[in-house]
């Protein structure tokens, strides 16, 4: 029975603790160096900024082409679909409905 426990004990032998070769090439690995280093001098940065300013100016000028809204295109009163509403009668119905709710509250026991 002692022979079965040998496989689970920790060992300092590099052959036993070798990393799995199947996972070596996945996701993470040693970083590689770029073959051509890029030069980031101040002269290049300044030219990039001027190009960005030109783009921003073009965007600001493009917003002035909006025409005002024509009031004849606005449709009003479509929610009622042509029905005339008597607001006095509707308010009276709401008051009547509120009274029915109060009666239901009296029967409620917490």
From Swiss-Prot:
It is found in: Nucleus. Pfam families: CHZ. Residues 41-64, 97-110 have a biased composition (Acidic residues). InterPro entries: Histone_chaperone_domain_CHZ (IPR019098). One of its GO terms (cellular component) is nucleus. Keywords: Chaperone, Nucleus. The keyword Chaperone applies. Its main location: nucleus. Residues 1-14 have a biased composition (Polar residues). Residues 1-110 are annotated as: Disordered. The keyword Nucleus applies. Forms a heterotrimer with H2A.Z-H2B, stabilizing the association of the histone dimer. Also, with a lower affinity, forms a heterotrimer with H2A-H2B. Forms a chaperone-bound H2A.Z-H2B complex that acts as a source for SWR1 complex-dependent H2A to H2A.Z histone replacement in chromatin. Belongs to the CHZ1 family. This is Histone H2A.Z-specific chaperone chz1. It comes from Aspergillus oryzae (strain ATCC 42149 / RIB 40). The gene is chz1.
